[in-house]
């Protein structure tokens, strides 16, 4: 048993940040809370930590209700985005702080504290930095020290609020890979907030996608990305092209293309939207009858391994994006201004509307 929240409600004035939300975090898993700004992810994390009080609902740790306990008594380690290290203390003193401020009857001996701190420094691969000050460390190193300090008190759960948000892209990628390896080593039940879709999909065992204080989908990275529950999840998790059309009798007409949509076989004459990832937009030199849409190449941009191509549909004038790998692009020898034809490798059709 890990963390369970039941029917949580949290309001700030007239704004409902958490709206009757329930969630299970299994023991030993690393779970990401992901969503747009204002979706409630940080508020949910702070309620779990005891830094915010819910207006309604329960927070349960390993089968025991902890809603009335303050943050200090919940046994959680919390890592903030901006490190929150004590500048006047050495790295050793920062990590030891949570142990040294315990009341005397619960405080470990100095030798035990020293061994614990040095063990954690080794765990975060900074054992030679124990006598330095935070100002002498890089941002990535400071965040690893903040994590070591959170682990020093031997928490039952680890909570992280956008732990890599203040770091540059390269360091952020290195640290999230490191966090995944660390979690696999210590297996502490962990929940982290992120606004970075790639980060959530790379690091976590499960992703919780929130919108307007409610959960839209919970699943493994593969489940939420490749089998999105609704149009909001599909649109939120990466770039997408939208194709408007109508559903009738198990088929959807999207401009000049008709696609089979048996999942909507009972719907008659309803507006629909087809969702296609850029890498599922295939570019052809010659048309294929009833399967392609003519388009003009507007812009070509290489990102190194891949090439992004903006195209304008000749039937509607709308702009869409295709993504090719470099070898595909070279074989087609495309140039701006050329007319080509596009078709979809994969498309998902939704009938309901979405908003972000």
UniProtKB/Swiss-Prot annotation:
Residues reported to bind ATP: 35-42
Taxon lineage: Bacteria, Pseudomonadati, Spirochaetota, Spirochaetia, Leptospirales
Pfam families per the UniProt record, alphabetical: ABC_tran, CysA_C_terminal, TOBE_3
Organism: Leptospira interrogans serogroup Icterohaemorrhagiae serovar Lai (strain 56601)
Domain ABC transporter: 3-237
Subunit relationships: The complex is composed of two ATP-binding proteins (CysA), two transmembrane proteins (CysT and CysW) and a solute-binding protein (CysP).
Disulfide-bonded cysteines: none
Catalyzed reactions: sulfate(out) + ATP + H2O = sulfate(in) + ADP + phosphate + H(+); thiosulfate(out) + ATP + H2O = thiosulfate(in) + ADP + phosphate + H(+)
Protein name: Sulfate/thiosulfate import ATP-binding protein CysA
Main localisation: membrane
Topology relative to the membrane: Peripheral membrane protein
Molecular function (Gene Ontology), one example: ATP hydrolysis activity
